[in-house]
Amino acid sequence: NSNFVILAPNGLQDTAQSEEICYTSEATVSDDELKGMIDYAKELGMRVALKPTVNCKNGTWRAHVNFFDEDVVCEPKWCNWFESYTEFQLHYARLAKEMGVEMHIAGCEMVMAERREAEWRKLIADIRSEFDGLVSYNTDKYQEHNVKWWDAVDVISSSGYYPLEDWENQLDR
């Protein structure tokens, strides 16, 4: 019996090295469409989480979004990407608060970006300034130990695509 649904509105960036994230094009769900989905889920008695998720238009997996650790003139920069990513996340944090959503998941499988601890801590603090519910982050399988800022979120999440025959062992790691 299901009682919780995660809705994942998408943002798009051209490549893994693009700094701008678009979440208002025809290729993304509109706010009105998302609000309709939230209302419908609540009518069914379900609790709702929003997981705004960025993807690359060229098909590169979002885990590979990556830039130089040091700013280099004429190269894409983490600071610009996180500025755009924060705008994207805060848009949905405000919508989540407006709609009475229970949880905001601040990212999904952003493996290369996870090392940017200061930026993630600031993002999560910014989300908390706009949203009163639970805040989570969803890392990729086998990457849980690399996230040094788990203490900043309320719920730890991992995309555990583990073999069924080894499920119990994977839960014990």
Predicted regions: what is each one?
Residues 3-19, 32-113:
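Substrate-binding cleft and catalytic face of glycoside hydrolase catalytic domains
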Residues 57-59, 117, 167:
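Short, function-defining helix-loop hinge/capping sites that tune catalysis or transport
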Residues 23-24, 66-69, 123, 153-156:
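Short, hinge-like loop/turn segments at secondary-structure boundaries
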Residues 29-31, 36-47, 51, 129, ...:
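Glycoside hydrolase catalytic-domain groove-lining segments
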Residues 88, 98, 103, 114-137:
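Active-site neighborhood of glycoside hydrolase catalytic domains
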Residues 24-29, 80:
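Short coil/turn segments at secondary-structure boundaries
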Residues 17-26, 168-171:
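Short, flexible/disordered intra-domain loops and linkers
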Residues 64, 81-84, 123, 152-153, ...:
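Enriched - but not universal
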